[in-house]
Amino acid sequence: MKKPLNSAEEKKTGDITKAEIEAIKSGLHSNPFQIIPLHETPEGFSARCFIPGAEEVSVLTLDGNFVGELKQIDPDGFFEGRIDLSKRQPVRYRACRDDAEWAVTDPYSFGPVLGPMDDYFVREGSICGYSTGWARIPLKLEGVEGFHFAVWAPNGRRVSVVGDFNNWDGRRHVMRFRKDTGIWEIFAPDVYACAYKFEILGANGELLPLKADPYARRGELRPKNASVTAPELTQKWEDQAHREHWAQVDQRRQPISIYEVHAGSWQRSEDGTFLSWDELEAQLIPYCTDMGFTHIEFLPITEHPYDPSWGYQTTGLYAPTARFGDPEGFARFVNGAHKVGIGVLLDWVPAHFPTDEHGLRWFDGTALYEHADPRQGFHPDWNTAIYNFGRIEVMSYLINNALYWAEKFHLDGLRVDAVASMLYLDYSRKEGEWIPNEYGGRENLESVRFLQKMNSLVYGTHPGVMTIAEESTSWPKVSQPVHEGGLGFGFKWNMGFMHDTLSYFSREPVHRKFHHQELTFGLLYAFTENFVLPLSHDEVVHGKGSLIAKMSGDDWQKFANLRSYYGFMWGYPGKKLLFMGQEFAQWSEWSEKGSLDWNLRQYPMHEGMRRLVRDLNLTYRSKAALHARDCEPDGFRWLVVDDHENSVFAWLRTAPGEKPVAVICNLTPVYRENYYVPLGVAGRWREILNTDAEIYGGSGKGNGGRVQAVDAGGEIGAMLVLPPLATIMLEPEN
């Protein structure tokens, strides 16, 4: 048993005790700033340092001037001595051992970066600028270039930044603790492009697994998982016109057609490796431009350790994944997209986080970012941890991340994942597995406040940026303003549309008359939210099959069904979203392990489908009636709603001052002639799109390009040819 130090054994070496030396050597000292920095005595300045492995140490100014030799006071690397300085300033140590020599800029000779005002803003929950106010960023301090590291770990006994620059030795860069906020900080020179993590001694003295930086702007390529020091972006942005356009318009009245992309499997290089951001810029952006999409939405491109998670289990919310290059590359991609008028959206995951040991879970030895009680802090569906939205530091971390992507990378919006799981305390839980809110209800009030604040700040500080909720329940006012009691999202995914329409089109046509309501019911709520119609990645994975595989009938009918479905969707009120590969009817289910089946485009039916999607986009964008009232009931009117027997649907899309567009769907393989549709406007109507056209792989049936609407007994209509399993669109010529 180690006996206590007596007064003789407690004697000081200079003004440092043996106990303090041993505490630093063993990694147990929590504040070396008290004893290691330069200190002033009546005789002048003295220096003290701990450099393991050194046998000799001399002291230099940052200009390289020699100011003194230090004496070894402990064989494990402690040195101390008088130096010739007239004022306090940062110094550099030159260490020697045998024939080796190396330099160490003393991190303890710098003052703090954060001050009382920073502490105040952190405590009161300031949002704007929080991430750049104390995140690890490059800066110049006291004339020296370096990085400011800071991390929130209020329950840690000792926190160090470790990395390539100090041989991952947690005794070398022990951070300064700011007790009012729980933040630890240190300024470290000579750490450019270095891998690093935080070494944390927990509240009970236990050494925790090394933690990646929650605010890191760059990470290592998996399977490595350290953070990497990164400079500020130097991108020269050329997207002012694009951003000004979206800031000035009502997004609800603009054409929005989103191409959903998994960056790692859209295309691969010949050797099977990922495309870089520059390669994606050169290939994906021109493809989307040609296809007529207005936006690219990426599945999460934030850093994540596990490819099959598709990015939805992220450990680095501030870092674009290293799979496709550095953050500058992603900035170039966004700039390139904006230059040709294409917006970039990011799937964003504030609902939960993975339990990888280098991540946020049990960050400082306590449940810091998550709830301690698994009834609140563990997600049974995904085996992940749930953020504690009631902690102001957690809320600030997430909200600043949303602002960060808009500010630093000029993103056009965030599609917020798994919103339903955030809103309900009993989501995927049985009785007894959840804790009611303060009023005894199942609503997660802390999450509601978080979402409202996030949306208010995004829209308030970045006009033109949109937020989209993936929300699958009937929670009211998801896309209504916060001041009207809503959650404040700009748009919401219409999961009901997706479910009902896929169910309908998978049925054999002979049975469809019994399920007519699957295509009409959605109009009862189509304008209660600002909807996006999503045919997303979720519908083509986990054994669900691709969209073409879901369609009923033989191969010809499958293609005809999918073409008519796309026509139905592009004519239906709501913004559009289509997952990659479905535009050319890929047969196989999507997998993140390889590229899409681009070879299918050599076959006419697949290439015809692609041409149809392109023409649908171009028609949707060029015809205001198809988009300007996507979210308002006065832009839609049924023409034929109850023809169950023939499975025919027709409606009129309108916009003020614009020509109306009639959408007619014949969803059986029966070719119909002289089918009457009440169009409401007399004169010639032009057929502007026909999904049965031969160029799309159809039979070529149609109306010869035009029909004549006449007044017959007070009702204006036309006798139409309805191609089999097809959607046509008509527009009056005058």
From Swiss-Prot:
Record PANTHER family: 1,4-ALPHA-GLUCAN-BRANCHING ENZYME
Physiological role: Catalyzes the formation of the alpha-1,6-glucosidic linkages in glycogen by scission of a 1,4-alpha-linked oligosaccharide from growing alpha-1,4-glucan chains and the subsequent attachment of the oligosaccharide to the alpha-1,6 position.
Substrates-to-products reaction catalysed: Transfers a segment of a (1->4)-alpha-D-glucan chain to a primary hydroxy group in a similar glucan chain
The entry's keywords: Carbohydrate metabolism, Glycogen biosynthesis, Glycogen metabolism, Glycosyltransferase, Transferase
Pathway: Glycan biosynthesis; glycogen biosynthesis
Active site feature: D417, E470
Gene Ontology annotations for the cellular component aspect, listed alphabetically: cytosol
E.C. no: 2.4.1.18
Coiled-coil stretches: none
An annotated Gene Ontology molecular function: 1,4-alpha-glucan branching enzyme activity
Organism superkingdom: Bacteria
Species assigned in the record: Rhizobium radiobacter (Agrobacterium tumefaciens)
Biological process annotations from GO: glycogen biosynthetic process
Protein family: Belongs to the glycosyl hydrolase 13 family. GlgB subfamily.
UniProt protein name: 1,4-alpha-glucan branching enzyme GlgB
Entry-linked InterPro entries: A-amylase/branching_C, Branching_enzy, GlgB, GlgB_N, GlgB_N_E_set_prok, Glyco_hydro_13_cat_dom, Glyco_hydro_13_N, Glyco_hydro_b
UniProt key word NAD: no
Keyword Transferase: yes
Subunit (UniProt): Monomer.
